[in-house]
């Protein structure tokens, strides 16, 4: 027995999965053919661009500064001068033991960086303020021991 779609039904009167289905007919869109020509290659003459060279200033400077804080004991100074490719300078600072460390340096293209360190003993050590540390008391409470 066949149903309205042509599927074979079993004589038992029940329904079963169809034996096979045919795929619908597929339709394809028409293919459009395009004729593309190769792009035309054109070469242009290079454009000459005028570049203005900025003048390079001659490197020359000089600076110095100093700090003298008696409260913290921060005592230092520095000075430096540059003339062309030669840099000369020095800095000094007071060490915690009261001595003064002075560094004199020079740097140039021929000799590189060179430094000489001098140490001058201090007349008296710089007193550093002691740090006061106070701890809060720890509260301890013992739990009572209970026997059953």
From Swiss-Prot:
One of its GO terms (molecular function) is structural constituent of cuticle. Keywords: Cuticle, Repeat. Residues 58-128 form the Chitin-binding type R&R domain. Sequence repeats lie at residues 16-19, 22, 28-31, 37-40, 44-47. It comes from the Eukaryota. One of its GO terms (cellular component) is extracellular matrix. InterPro entries: CHIT_BIND_RR_consensus, Insect_cuticle, Insect_Cuticle_Struc_Prot. Signal peptide: none annotated. Component of the cuticle of migratory locust which contains more than 100 different structural proteins. PANTHER family: CUTICULAR PROTEIN 76BD, ISOFORM C-RELATED (PTHR12236:SF95), STRUCTURAL CONTITUENT OF CUTICLE (PTHR12236). The tetrapeptide (A-A-P-[AV]) repeats found throughout the protein are also present in many proteins constituting the protective envelope of other species. This is Cuticle protein 8. It comes from Locusta migratoria.
